[in-house]
Amino acid sequence: LAACFVLPVEDDLDSIFKSLHYAAKISKSGSGTGFNFSRLRPKNDVISSVTGFSSGPMSFMKIFDAVTEQIKLGGLRRGAHMGILRVDHPDIGEFVTIKAKEKVLENFNISVAITDKFMNAVQKDKSYNLINPRTQKNVRDESAEKIFDLICETAHKTGDPGVIFLDKINKDNPTPALGILESTDSCGEQPLLPYESANLGSINLSNIIINNKIDFNKLKNTVHKTIHFLDNVIDMCKYPTPETKEIVHANRKIGLGVMGFADLLIKLKIPYNSERAVKTAEKLIAFIRKEADNASVNLTKERLTFPNWDESIYNKK
C-alpha cells in the first residue's frame, strides 16, 4: 500500500548491494525508492583495500537503473527511483548533466541536495568547496554561480535535476534525534529517514465546492477521515524489509496532499494566475494543516502517541 521507500547507501559494497537487493524487491511490488548517493567516494578516488580506484556514484546509479529495467511488472510497469547527490560532492558536474544523454538513468528522477551555504555563495558570486565524502577534505573550489547555472540550464532542457533544500527540510524534521533528512521518495513529495515509507493520500478539492462556495465543513470532515485512513494504512501495509516495518511503525509518518486545485478555481471563476488564486491556496492549505493536526491529536485519544514520540520535537512543545 505504501507508494515509496527510502534506502540508505553507504560507501561500501555490502551496503550498496544490500540496498540494491531491497530496491529490486520494492520495484517488483510496484513501489518506488529514494536514494542519496552522496556518501559514495568520487570517481578516481583511491580504494586502498584493492589498490584500485573508485568508479564514482554515477556508475552505481547505472547498476540500480539496469536492475530496475529488468524487473517488469506484468510487462507494463517498472519501479521508479529518486537519486540525490549533494551539491558539494566532487562529481556534481557529471551528476547534473547525466540525464542530458538519451537512454541514461531512465528509471531515475535526479535531484541536487542544496545547502544554505551554497546558495549564499551563489548570491555573492563566490566559490565553494567540493568535499570528498571519504576524507571530508576539500578536493577543489568551484564557482557556485557556474554550478547553479548548470543546474538551471539542464533542468530547463531535460526536466532534471530537481533540487532539495537540505537545511529547510531538516528545519522541519520531526525526529532530528533519529537522524538527518537527506532523501525523499521517488517523486520528491516527502523527505524521509532511511527505511521510512511514503504513505500518501490526496484530497480532491474539486469535490468541496457546494453552491459555488468552498464547503469548509465538508473539507474538515474529509481531512479527519483521511488522516484516520492513512494511519490505518500503516498497520495494514506489507513491508519489504524488517527495517522498514520497524521504523514506519515507530514514527507513523503520513503525507496528506491535494489534487483538483485548478478545477476548484474554475468552479469559483478565479483565474489561475491571479493573486486571488494564491490567497485561496494559502487559506486552503492552512485550514487543511490545522485540521490534520487536530485529527492527529484526536487519534492519540484512541491509539496513544506514536512510539518514537519521546524522540520527536513534539515532546518538547
Give short role names for the model-derived ranges.
Residues L1-A2, V6-S49, P57-F60, I71, ...:
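Function-dense linear segments that define catalytic or interfacial modules
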Residues F37-K43, I84-I92, T115, T135-N138, ...:
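A glycine-rich phosphate-binding loop feature that marks nucleotide/adenosyl-phosphate handling sites
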Residues L13, I47, I71-G83, E102-L105, ...:
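Inter-helical turn/loop segments and adjacent helix faces that build the functional surface
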Residues T97-T158:
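Polar, glycine-rich mid-to-C-terminal structural blocks
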Residues R252-P271:
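Extended amphipathic alpha-helical segments enriched in small hydrophobics
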Residues T51-A66, G93:
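Glycine- and Gly-Pro-enriched alpha-helical subdomains that act as flexible
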Residues L1-D12, P133-T154, T158-V163, K283-K317:
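Gly/Pro-rich turn-and-neighbor structural signature
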Residues L1, L20, T222-K245, H249, ...:
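Internal maturation/activation junctions in enzymes
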